[in-house]
Amino acid sequence: MAALSTGLSTSSGDLTQSADEDGFLDAPLLPSQKLQSVIRPHFHPVPTICISILLALVNLAYVTLAVVAIYFCLFSEKEKKCKQSIDPFQLSTVLVISKLVLWLLHVVNERFAQHHHCKARSRGFLHLYRSTRHLKALPLIIHSTGNAALLLILSVQDSFTSNSQLYPCLILSVLLLELILSVICLIIYTVRIYRFNKSKPRPDIIEEEKINAFHGHVNPEIGFRHSASLEEVVEKQGDTIEYLKHHNALLSKQLLALASNQD
């Protein structure tokens, strides 16, 4: 009797499980277009181009105004009128204060770019993040170095006042060098981001799978390259795992939302 009751309960459990599986299989399937829209990630461009162009124009305008101010306040016949217009400040003080404002703009631009590049990194664009990691910070580094050079010039100016017209020319030379180097970096960065946004690539891991499938082999180790260092391999593996975790969590939420809408 005990064996009979055990067999009946097992059979009843199998029937219940079979009924549940049949009900699950009979559930309406999600449309293929909706599945494709969920599985294929939507491309989000990196919105840093306009800020970089605007910052380059501000940098150019600042250096142009500095050249005009130095010329009219030191080398033209309107020297007294120019000094009266900036009174009670000296010309070097005005240049340094405006230079500080420009440096703060570069700090804001670097933080803004870093924020959006981290978001692109979480979406799987690991190569873009690495290739622009130092490039986007170069203008800020250049201007920080220029600030140190200006402090050195001003400290020497207070100690040696024999040639008062030499120091504004040295300041102008530093500003021109900063302008050339930072604008070159901003242009290179802007072109690279513009090409990335225009091409609208898929995440790096999807592109690598496509290339491996085309060549007929599968890469057994994520991020492994024979020419890469161990640090690069570990960093890329960590970034890839973080992207996959983020993508799987987002995909699960979207599939659950679509399934609830079908009910």
Swiss-Prot record:
Keyword Transmembrane in record: yes
GO CC aspect terms: late endosome; lysosomal membrane
Record's bilayer topology term: Multi-pass membrane protein
Gene coding for it: tmem192
Subunit field text: Homodimer.
Matching Pfam families: TMEM192 (PF14802)
Family in the record: Belongs to the TMEM192 family.
Signal peptide interval: none
Transmembrane annotation, as ranges: 53-73, 88-108, 137-157, 169-189
Domain of life: Eukaryota
Keywords linked to the UniProt accession: Endosome, Lysosome, Membrane, Transmembrane, Transmembrane helix
Localization: Lysosome membrane; Late endosome
The keyword Membrane appears for this protein: yes
Protein name, entry field: Transmembrane protein 192
Record-linked InterPro entries: TMEM192
